[in-house]
Structure formats: C-alpha cells, structure tokens
C-alpha cells in the first residue's frame, strides 16, 4: 500500500516554474438536515450558521480552495451556496435522480479562480451511468462527483472527486473503491498532459478495511504525504454526536492519484464542537494544504 512519506515535489516544481499555487482541499460530511435530531444532534437551523462561519474562516485568504461535501440535500446545498457568498458556486446533482432528489456530493469552487472544464456524476453501481442505481449490497444509491478545473491565471489543471460510500454493504464499498481507482485513471490526463486527481469523501471505512486498501494500492492517502510534525488536530473524523471518544472512527479521507510535483504543506482534521457544546456535524472536516506548479507544462507526459 502507498502509505509512506513520499516527498516528490520541490525540485520538480522549481525546474518547471518558480511560481506555485497554494492549494487547500477540504472534505466534509455535513450531516443531512432532519426533522427530529437524535441524541446530541441539533437541527440544521442551529448548525447552519456555525458551519457557514467555519467554512468562511477556513477558505479566507485561500482563493484556490476547493471544498467537497457529503450528505447535503438540495436545501442544504442552497444554504451553503448562500452562506459562502456570490464568489462561490458548485457542481453536483442529487443521487436519487441525477437532478435535485436525494443527497448531493457537491464540490464548491470560486469561478473567478477556477474554470470548470468538465464534470460528471457516476453512480457507485454496476451501471454507473444510470441515475439512482444501487450497487451490489448497498442500502442506498451512492455517487461520486468528478470535476476537472483549469486555473484561470496559469492554465494549471486539477481534478477533484467527491464521494460517499455505503454505510451497510461491504461488497459495495470494495467494488466502489475499484470503480473509483479506474475513474481516477480516466481523469488523470488532458491533451497528453497529466494532472493531479484527488478523491475526498466519507468512505465509511477505516484504514484497515479492504476498500481503503484498494484505494491505497493505487492512490496515496494525503495524510501520509505530510510529515507527522505538520499534521494537526484529531485523528478520528466521525464523532456520532457524542463526546465519548470510544465511538469515534477514522472514515473520512483524502487521496491523490499522482503526487509528482506537489509540495505538501499541512494536513488537519478540524474540530466541530466548541464552548457552546453544539456539534456542527457528526463528522469533522479533513483539510490538506499543498503547493502545485502553476503551469500546465510542468506535467507534460513523455
């Protein structure tokens, strides 16, 4: 598995261009809005302003930031869009029908910084192009949103994949991992130039799970790209809306397919509960910072 500290990067960046792009990627399961909250859970109307403040803080001064979310039903997507302001927009559809039904896995970006060149939604099933399809032993439809962006001022490209694996079906999780490995490969080149492909999401698996290991055999966990002294915060990403750490798990991850040329800065699992004792979500956001070459020519194949 590709878990070691691999420091590609600084030399490759310097030879291609003295300029780099300061990147921040986030993945965050925001917990879908429900009519009646469970133990420890506040309603979305209470959590929403806290989450908006957190997101605005984490993206402030980082124009190239890309943020992906899970469990966002359409009204929540609209709330995030409104809370982040006019400088942001998003790409993504509902998993039930490929339109507005069911949970989204949206990717938010600033269109003044990134131009959306291509995007697609695939269902994690034997028929990935069939909206609403349920794969293998999954309990629900599951999707991955994929988007390729071009940096407006430099032409550099990056692809981001946002997904949410099934919480019941182990076969579905393993097969979904194989599907995403293949998709990451398909999205890894453009006009004979390679580009970094990132995968963020709530995978509902810990690192000892075969589904995680399938991803780690072909991609790199961003956490392990960053030296330990530059990792911050929690290890566990799911809290179940409780303060008891015994039921916390590490199930939210960010992977990268090809880290060559990237200079890794920091990794963090952020807090979601403060003095007001309100959980913003039952998941903690995962954030990785890195620098990437600002010229597309830096990653020419051959």
Predicted segments with their positions:
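Active-site beta-strand/loop signature of hydrolases that rely on acidic residues for catalysis
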Residues: 24-30, 51-80, 108, 147, ...
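Structured beta-strand-rich core segments of catalytic domains in phosphoester-bond hydrolases
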Residues: 66-157, 161, 165, 269
